[in-house]
Amino acid sequence: MLPFPAPPTTEQQATLDALRAEVAAIRAMQDSQWVDARRAEAVRATVRDALADVGTRTSFLQDAGTCGYDHGTFVRSSDGNWLFRAGILQQQRFVAAFAPAAKGVPDQNMWGFDVHRFNLTLSGHAIDPSITWNMTGAWNSQPDRFVTEGGKFRLLYGLVRKDWGEGWSTIVGLHNVPWDLESDFFGSSRLTTGEYSVFNYRFGMGKHEGISMLWEGTDVRMKAGTYSQLNQASLVWDNPVNLSWAVAARVEAKVGADWEQLSWLSSRPGDRPGLVAGLGFVWSTGRADNPPDTRAAQGFTVDLRAALGGTTLIAQYALERDAVGLPDLQWSSGLNLQASTFLTDVVEPFASGSWMQDAGVPWILQAGFNWYVAGQNTLKLTTKVVVPLGTGEINGQTNISGGLGIMPSGNGCGIVSQLQLLY
């Protein structure tokens, strides 16, 4: 017979069943822990992938640069070496000009609305922040001192500037000729008396193509350059009116207010007080082999500006040959006195008187106020009265009447109300 083990007793069977149950429980627990470990590893892998994706997306965002608004809409590279900015200037106005005529002759009174000026400014820096550029196109409703044809889009500024450090820089292209007080200002958006200074309208050198050097220190700055022309439009190298030689220079010294604050003609309430003295010089020779005969601007100008924390006082004098405000080519002197003060944080009355020797209308007076609706010139309403003291021809050698808002001759006065948007 084969030996067979005796069947387990009841007590032994109970012990075996308990052991089997315990082993099954241990196996189930181990299986659960293994699954949890696999799940944890899967979660960790998902988190790692998500973090890597976020890092990649962030790096793409950094490479794409930033955009926003700062004196115009801008796009800047992540390293700061490239910047593109776009801005606009709009000047909408109502003008009423009165010219009383002799008895029995109808008065020459005119009035109406127009979009006086629209500027599109593109600017920025390239390669690195020391190389800046500016391209400004301008549309004017009618001819004036600086625009020979109205109703056309033309180049107003086109320049490249290189900063060499230690305050030195070079400017090449179409830019302001260093001469009088208004030479420091970009366009007309920062002037107190609206769109023009009468003094600069008559004696100014304008904007011309050339090359200039600029040095700016804490309290002194100087700019000097050579140009194709000085006081009439010339945008090409072979223009018959180009001068044989044309140089201009300006030096300024100040105490008090910093240069950035002085880049706005009006001193605002709360600004640091300051005093600025300026001296400008121009010299040129006509080009006899290029008919017709060209003007040869020569002369000097001095000016003094007191910025008194809400009040601004200005005095200017010029002695100039062949100024555009004269009826003939000759020497003439001129004077401008101007004052403005803030009655509130947003309302600024102003008055000015400009005199020009031997002009058809020697004196031109202005008085009015600025209402800064929003920001520092962002949205500004200028309303003024322009009063020529005299009834002679006011155009001089160029069409200045339309820009000033008065008739060419027989003037009584002009009323100008202009809304400016600077974006």
Across the structure, where does each feature detected by a protein language model lie?
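Outer membrane beta-barrel
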Residues: 68-232, 239-259, 265-273, 331-350, ...
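Outer-membrane beta-barrel pore domains
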Residues: 99, 106, 145-146, 159-163, ...
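Generic anion/oxyanion-binding catalytic loop in active/binding sites
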Residues: 8, 109, 404
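A broadly tuned "polar low-complexity/structure-edge" signature
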Residues: 43-46, 51, 83, 94, ...
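N-terminal periplasmic/intermembrane-space "pro-region" immediately following the signal or transit peptide
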Residues: 1-91, 103, 259-262, 418, ...
